[in-house]
Amino acid sequence: MNSTSTHFVPPRRVGIYEPVHQFGMWGESFKSNISNGTMNTPNHIIIPNNQKLDNNVSEDTSHGTAGTPHMFDQEASTSRHPDKIQRRLAQNREAARKSRLRKKAYVQQLETSRLKLIQLEQELDRARQQGFYVGNGIDTNSLGFSETMNPGIAAFEMEYGHWVEEQNRQICELRTVLHGHINDIELRSLVENAMKHYFELFRMKSSAAKADVFFVMSGMWRTSAERFFLWIGGFRPSDLLKVLLPHFDVLTDQQLLDVCNLKQSCQQAEDALTQGMEKLQHTLADCVAAGQLGEGSYIPQVNSAMDRLEALVSFVNQADHLRHETLQQMYRILTTRQAARGLLALGEYFQRLRALSSSWATRHREPT
């Protein structure tokens, strides 16, 4: 046992040694100890507790593990300072939270800027359609920019843009299912969604009419070809029936009778609303024209006309109510598949009008 210890040389006296040879000596030492039934450790490999750090470094370096003590020191340091670790983790979490908040604010700012840009583009298009140009010396405030833009109308235009996108999606869906195989239950769900989509448009128009009834009446939110067929802020229900009838499958005698009665009722209601509008126009004209020539003050006439304009909002709502009831009655008269074909025909009709408007607008820009 003593002879085994003489093979080891204290590390301080040897700088570099052969690892293979050293491992061989370790193996012989352990074998001899185990064969004698004892496990004596040579005195020179027992490291005193008070040995300096540089001795450990030199010994580990000689065994090819110079970086290990530094790693152990870091682990010991972190284990001795848990509060410091928690503070650093808390700082990192706070920095990440602030970064997310800055990113969210930046995205919101971009979205706000995008909406403002869309609003300005719509206002410019509306100004061009009305024939107002800044170059002609008209004040920019009269063009309806954000300083004087009615927020209710701006919201309506945004909603209507989304409404048209959703309508186009529903038209594509109806076209696909009608050319494929679908049961009546699923088809009924699509038809009801399309009906509700039109009812949502009537609700939007009612809110917009309260904000600016002249805007709704003028149809500035529609394309030029659609405005050509405008009647009290929308389509005539009787014209709707003319568009739909050729696209239905063979109707029964009872269905034909119901459709004819509905068409007659629509025309009577349209005539009544048209006469009421004409009477209102005459009343407004009389109110505005009243007063002495050269009076200079129009306040009494304007106030009198303002009181009568509330009736104009009622006319818009009544016209949309007639459109709503016409769609609802057609839905009751027709089968589910016939109603789906009718809604597809109606949607494609408005798509063609919008396409006609775009073609007409680009025609003027083409070189001659």
From Swiss-Prot:
Pfam families: bZIP_1, DOG1. Residues 84-104 are annotated as: Basic motif. The keyword Membrane does not apply. GO terms for molecular function: DNA-binding transcription factor activity; sequence-specific DNA binding; transcription cis-regulatory region binding. PROSITE patterns: BZIP, BZIP_BASIC, DOG1. Residues 153-363 form the DOG1 domain. Predominantly expressed in roots. It comes from the Eukaryota. Residues 82-145 form the bZIP domain. Keywords: Activator, Coiled coil, Disulfide bond, DNA-binding, Nucleus, Transcription, Transcription regulation. PANTHER family: TRANSCRIPTION FACTOR TGA1, TRANSCRIPTION FACTOR TGA9. Transcriptional activator that binds specifically to the DNA sequence 5'-TGACG-3'. Recognizes ocs elements like the as-1 motif of the cauliflower mosaic virus 35S promoter. Binding to the as-1-like cis elements mediate auxin- and salicylic acid-inducible transcription. May be involved in the induction of the systemic acquired resistance (SAR) via its interaction with NPR1. Could also bind to the Hex-motif (5'-TGACGTGG-3') another cis-acting element found in plant histone promoters. This is Transcription factor TGA1. It comes from Arabidopsis thaliana (Mouse-ear cress). The gene is TGA1.
